[in-house]
Amino acid sequence: MFHSDHTTIQIIGHLLIAFLFIYRCLTAMPRFAEHSSRLASRGIPFSGFVLTFGLGFMLVGGVSVAIDYYAQYGSVLLILFTMAAIYVHHNFWDTTDPMEKNRKLYIACNNTAVIGGILLIISL
């Protein structure tokens, strides 16, 4: 399952990152229509198709990282998804309301930190 050279801390890191994405994917699936409509309202063409790929990236990437099977490739999927989420959903640069801008910036910063954790998985 895990490479023999992984420490316990590295395994825990893998599992925590994977849990975040798998959990969010599984909780988003039942609300597919709602999420697809939100993407469409933001001007994303073929929103259902885009959402399907996004959920697939989260699930495949998360499972890949969790079981350490091609974890580097799964990590790339998770980074691409997270970067897209920052651009589409947490675009603080386009927000005029100061409270909303601060909320989006906070979430974008958290997502940037998650990308940092994923990069550490790639480096293993």
Identify the meaning behind each predicted range.
Residues 38-44:
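Interfacial loop at the N-terminal end of multi-pass membrane proteins
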Residues 1-34, 45-60, 66-124:
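Extended, low-polarity transmembrane helix blocks
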